[in-house]
Amino acid sequence: TSTRIALASAAQCSLDAADAAIGLLQAAGLQVSRLADIPGLAVMRTVAMLANEAADAVYQGVCSAQAADAAMRLGVNYPKGPLAWADSVGLQNIHTVLRHLGCSYGEDRYRVSPLIQQQVFAGKPLHG
């Protein structure tokens, strides 16, 4: 179980309200990281981008899904590979984050990998 939570306040949220929410969460024993209210926040945008790049490598025949995950687990000491992470947080969530990032920033780097699109539309995970 995590003891850290991220909190992003919308523009219409007062500083007093945000501080009160942080105080409540801290009283419940959670450590709070205050983040800017931007698309994807910090963790999901990073996980989504890693998963998207790994999915593109699989789609282009560079490696298998298992090999991509093993490379990241063993090569950079991630607790899970990016595709396993995508499956555990929900491939539909990854798809949605990438689409929102693409709409918000208009940059091609947020283009959803065809493999992720195929699997989401088929209702299937990347592994399995």
Label for each model-derived stretch:
Residues 1-128:
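NAD(P)-dependent Rossmann-like dehydrogenase/reductase catalytic/cofactor-binding core
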